[in-house]
Design a protein with these regions (language model features):
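Conserved proline-anchored active-site loop of SAM-dependent methyltransferases
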Residues: 74-87, 98-102, 163-165, 216-232
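S-adenosyl-L-methionine
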Residues: 26-68, 82
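Conserved hydrolase catalytic core segment
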Residues: 89-93
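Class I S-adenosyl-L-methionine-dependent methyltransferase module
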Residues: 95-197
């Protein structure tokens, strides 16, 4: 459905750097492979993310066609960037602003490290039965390998959680991971994110600030997709309460 903000259309769906033309906002334009030809369109985010809208991709594409005269799309609650990605693929002529408040881009930039870590864990687990609980020496070997990864840089604990923890459980750091049970759910293939953010202009701002900045521009469509009521927001880098829902709706 639609709503109005300073008389601008809203759509509610509940590595080279440059400056964008809006002086108040610094953006990072990822256009190593600008969309000059037909490129892959992802139907789900390349890395796990709580609340990505992969089940609504086909409907979202249909709704985008109603805004074929608009020139700027601002994804206020960018999340995994899936809506921004699809918008840019469907509308390569338009400017698409992806508000990466959860720093999903950092996870994508470290995808090779994540793949290497998971490959090493697959070697440790060997032919151990799938979905079985991991205990004893094997569990300690897992923890030792993950600790080693921490000493050399970034560890994507959210992605790691989907390979080791019971469904719906997530750890955000080593301490939390050590306190949870492990299961052999390790992904059997590498993750890929080729071209996922191509053409997007990536920012990291409070959604209110972004709405105020772009609300004065003509031809702007805001993609407003906040966390669902009742969703576990512990994996998000923002505090979200009932009052925030009311603020968005009003």
């Amino acid at each position: 459905r639609s709503m109005q903000y300073k008389c601008r259309p809203f759509f509610v769906f509940m590595g080279k750097t440059e400056e964008f033309c809006c002086p108040e906002i610094q953006t990072h334009i990822l256009h190593d492979k600008m969309i000059m030809k037909k490129e892959k369109t992802y139907s789900r985010a390349p890395l796990p993310f709580v609340g990505q809208k992969r089940m609504f991709v086909s409907e979202f594409k249909k709704i985008l066609k109603h805004f074929d005269d608009k020139t700027i799309f601002v994804d206020l609650f960018g999340g995994s960037g899936l809506l921004s990605h699809i918008t840019k693929r469907e509308r390569p002529d338009a400017v698409v602003i992806y508000n990466d408040h959860d720093n999903y881009r950092e996870r994508l930039e470290n995808i090779d490290r994540t793949n290497t870590l998971l490959r090493d864990l697959r070697k440790i687990v060997g032919i151990y039965p799938r979905h079985q609980k991991i205990t004893g020496k094997m569990r300690e070997a897992f923890l030792e390998r993950i600790r080693l990864e921490e000493t050399t840089g970034f560890v994507d604990y959210l992605t790691l959680s989907t390979s080791l923890l019971f469904s719906g459980k997530y750890a955000q750091n080593m301490e939390e991971l050590e306190g949870l049970y492990f299961y052999n759910k390790i992904r059997q293939s590498d993750y890929r994110c080729d071209g996922y953010l191509d053409g997007l202009e990536v920012v990291c701002y409070d959604y209110k600030e972004l709405a105020d900045t772009y609300g004065v521009f003509p031809g702007v469509v805001f993609l407003v997709d906040p966390p669902y009521m009742g969703t576990d927001i512990s994996t998000y880098k923002m505090d979200w309460k009932l009052a925030d829902y009311l603020d968005v709706l009003l």
